């Protein structure tokens, strides 16, 4: 069973093993949230050129040394045995791992996500139906459009002012 959680990955090493379409999508997702990513592969999908200034691209085959200091690892190669090896290593070393072709070896999954500034909405079917999660995400994108980015910013500013101005916890909650 999965537990929903938001994780701060600032100053954490993020490593993706693999250079194909899935690896690119995973790297782009981390970058869209403001993180730098290390990607290891012998070959890279051409789209990696679009994000090479925000990634450390290493042209090499997978070696354990590449993930020794990683906090979070994505195994996205086209080789199930390599992915399995990465997943097992991460489990042994208590690292967060997403093995793209074997959810049983993954310690986390990434929900379908909508980001509107500081408003982040994640939708997951716990891997049962990614297409349904994607459909729900599209429905929510229509409801929570780009205007929510500014709205959330305003609410955050108001909340700070209320917290500073009032000492009474009941009053703070009412406001």
Q: What feature does the model see in each segment?
A:
Residues 37, 57, 96-97:
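Hydrophobic beta-strand scaffold residues
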Residues 41, 58-61, 101:
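Short loop/edge segments at beta-strand edges and connector loops
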């Amino acid at each position: 069973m999965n537990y929903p959680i938001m994780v701060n990955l600032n100053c954490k090493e993020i490593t993706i093993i693999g250079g194909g379409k899935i690896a690119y999508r995973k790297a782009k997702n981390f970058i869209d949230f403001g993180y730098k990513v290390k990607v290891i592969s012998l070959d890279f999908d051409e789209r990696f050129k679009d994000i090479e200034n925000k990634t450390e691209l290493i042209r090499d085959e997978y070696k354990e040394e590449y993930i020794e200091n990683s906090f979070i690892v994505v195994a996205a190669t086209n080789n199930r045995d390599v992915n399995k090896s990465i997943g097992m290593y991460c489990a042994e070393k208590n690292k967060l791992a997403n093995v793209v072709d074997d959810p049983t070896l993954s310690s986390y999954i990434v929900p379908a996500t909508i980001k509107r500034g500081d408003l982040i909405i994640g939708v997951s079917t716990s891997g049962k139906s990614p297409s349904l999660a994607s459909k729900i995400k599209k429905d929510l994108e229509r409801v929570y459009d780009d205007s929510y980015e500014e709205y959330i910013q305003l609410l955050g500013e108001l909340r700070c002012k209320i917290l500073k101005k009032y000492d009474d916890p009941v009053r703070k909650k009412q406001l």
